[in-house]
């Protein structure tokens, strides 16, 4: 029987996961309805919809995976881990893609590379989304293949009844998977980190110029830049904490029955849940859609609903 602290953290984790699934389900539903009614989505909304869908699945798989492991259904965990690897990789890549898109479209750098990308990024987004899907699929296939080979090797070595050899092989495989996960996770995270930092630097420079021309603190443009910088800072913090939490969790030093494991899971998934909240709050369209959500009104209606006109 789990201890009282463990049960408390399990309850918090499940409620957090359900809230995050509801939040991301709202994003997918609103953007999906807009695409169905208007037959189009902006490039940024395409990335947000893909990111929300991957996070919805990630929270669901994480909740199922942790509950199965805590209930001693260990045979099902390796299969659930395959889905978790897929949706976690998609979440990292779509987060990086969204940060790179905003960096290219909003930043004011005069370098020729940024000028070239600014004109072509919108047309490249569908290809980048397909490329992210292919990369994540290859990552999952290679990871699943490695796990299968490790399982077969472990079974063959156990027949020799040499526990020391089995332990060494297991330790070497764990080190390999840790380094492999660290490598494949680091690529999208570095893209996200560089894009977000560059965008923050660009906005700070623009804000400094604007304050020189309009010294008033209540200027609407100045307030808009300040709010954008705050949301970017929160996004940077939450996504960085999620990435670091993944590394700590890959070390597998916490037992599933230990209540600290569940506390750690609450912390990990709270970061991406809060980042999804930032995405909703910084989008006027989604904020207005949230207010009118109970009515389920058509996104192609009047501009008062916040979706604007649907162009053919």
From Swiss-Prot:
Membrane-crossing ranges are: 5-27, 40-62, 82-104, 128-150, 183-205, 232-254, 259-281
InterPro entries of this UniProt entry?
A: TAS2R
Please report the record's description of how this protein sits within the membrane: Multi-pass membrane protein
Q: Where in the cell is it found?
A: Membrane
Task: Give this protein's Gene Ontology molecular function annotations.
Answer: bitter taste receptor activity; G protein-coupled receptor activity
Any one annotated GO CC term: plasma membrane
Q: Which residues are glycosylated?
A: 162
A matching Pfam family: TAS2R
Q: Which residues lie on this side of the membrane: Extracellular?
A: 1-4, 63-81, 151-182, 255-258
- Tell me which parts of the chain lie in the Cytoplasmic compartment: 28-39, 105-127, 206-231, 282-312
Keywords, in A-Z order: G-protein coupled receptor, Glycoprotein, Membrane, Receptor, Sensory transduction, Taste, Transducer, Transmembrane, Transmembrane helix
The UniProt record's further free-text remark is:
Most taste cells may be activated by a limited number of bitter compounds; individual taste cells can discriminate among bitter stimuli. The human orthologous protein does not exist, its gene is a pseudogene.
Query: What family classification does the UniProt entry report for this protein?
Result: Belongs to the G-protein coupled receptor T2R family.
Function recorded in the entry: Receptor that may play a role in the perception of bitterness and is gustducin-linked. May play a role in sensing the chemical composition of the gastrointestinal content. The activity of this receptor may stimulate alpha gustducin, mediate PLC-beta-2 activation and lead to the gating of TRPM5.
Name of the protein in its database record: Taste receptor type 2 member 62
Recorded name of the encoding gene: TAS2R62
């Amino acid at each position: 029987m789990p201890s009282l602290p463990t049960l408390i953290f399990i309850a918090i984790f499940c409620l957090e996961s359900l809230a995050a699934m509801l939040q991301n389900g709202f994003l997918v539903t609103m953007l999906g309805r807009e695409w169905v009614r208007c037959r189009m989505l902006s490039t940024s909304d395409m990335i947000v919809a893909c990111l929300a869908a991957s996070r919805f699945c990630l929270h669901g798989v994480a909740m199922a995976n942790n509950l199965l492991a805590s209930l001693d259904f260990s045979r099902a965990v390796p299969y659930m881990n395959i889905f978790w690897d897929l949706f976690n990789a998609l979440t990292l890549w779509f987060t990086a893609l969204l940060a790179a898109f905003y960096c290219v479209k909003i930043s004011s750098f005069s370098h020729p590379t940024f000028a070239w990308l600014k004109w072509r990024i919108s047309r490249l987004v569908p290809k980048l989304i397909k490329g992210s899907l292919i990369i994540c699929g290859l990552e999952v296939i290679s990871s699943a293949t490695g796990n299968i080979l490790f399982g077969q090797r472990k079974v063959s070595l156990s027949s020799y009844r040499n526990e020391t050899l089995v332990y060494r092989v297991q330790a070497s495989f764990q080190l390999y998977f840790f380094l492999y996960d660290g490598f494949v996770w680091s690529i999208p995270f570095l893209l996200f980190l560089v894009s977000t930092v560059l965008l923050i630097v660009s906005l700070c420079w623009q804000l400094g110029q604007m304050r020189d021309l309009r010294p008033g603190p209540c200027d609407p443009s100045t307030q808009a830049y300040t709010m954008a910088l705050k949301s970017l800072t929160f996004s940077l913090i939450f996504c960085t904490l999620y990435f670091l939490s993944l590394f700590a969790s890959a070390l597998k030093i916490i037992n599933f029955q230990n209540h600290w494991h569940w506390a750690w899971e609450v912390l990990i998934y709270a970061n991406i849940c809060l980042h999804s909240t930032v995405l909703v709050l910084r989008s006027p369209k989604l904020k207005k859609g949230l207010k009118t959500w109970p009515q389920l009104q058509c996104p192609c209606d009047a501009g008062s609903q916040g979706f604007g006109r649907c162009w053919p």
